[in-house]
Amino acid sequence: MTQHAYLVDDDEAIRDSLTWLLESRGVACASYPSAEDFLATWDSSLAGCIVLDIRMDGMSGPELFELLCERGCKLPVIFLTGHGDVPMAVSALKK
């Protein structure tokens, strides 16, 4: 059974790098440049994990995470950021 990852990051280089890394390990990837683009294709039957950038134009990663939780999403989520700090990390983990 193929594993799946959904990458949501506004930085194309990050999306490309993560796609290359994960696909080289046998993980199928779908990447999205924004939270809105991911939401346009998301449905509750998706399986795998979601990798979210914390800071994006438009809807942020934590905002997308909250919305997905409200919609009943049970997929594991990994947060990434190049601009993190301890309070931001604690806030994301508490949700």
What are these regions (language model features)?
Residues S45-V51:
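Active-site beta3 strand of CheY-like receiver
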Residues M56:
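Receiver (REC) domain active-site loop signature in two-component systems and cognate sites
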Residues R71, H83-G84:
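Short, conserved "switch-loop" micro-motifs in signal-transduction and mechanochemical regulators
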Residues G26-P33, T41, M59:
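Short hydrophobic/Thr-rich beta-strand motif most characteristic of the beta2 strand and flanking loop
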Residues P33-S34, M59-L64, G84:
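Acidic catalytic/metal-coordinating carboxylates
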Residues A40, P62-C73, S91:
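Short amphipathic alpha-helix used as the core "switch/output" element in two-component signaling
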Residues D53, T81:
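Active-site residues of response regulator receiver
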Residues E12-A30:
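Two-component/phosphorelay signaling modules centered on CheY-like receiver
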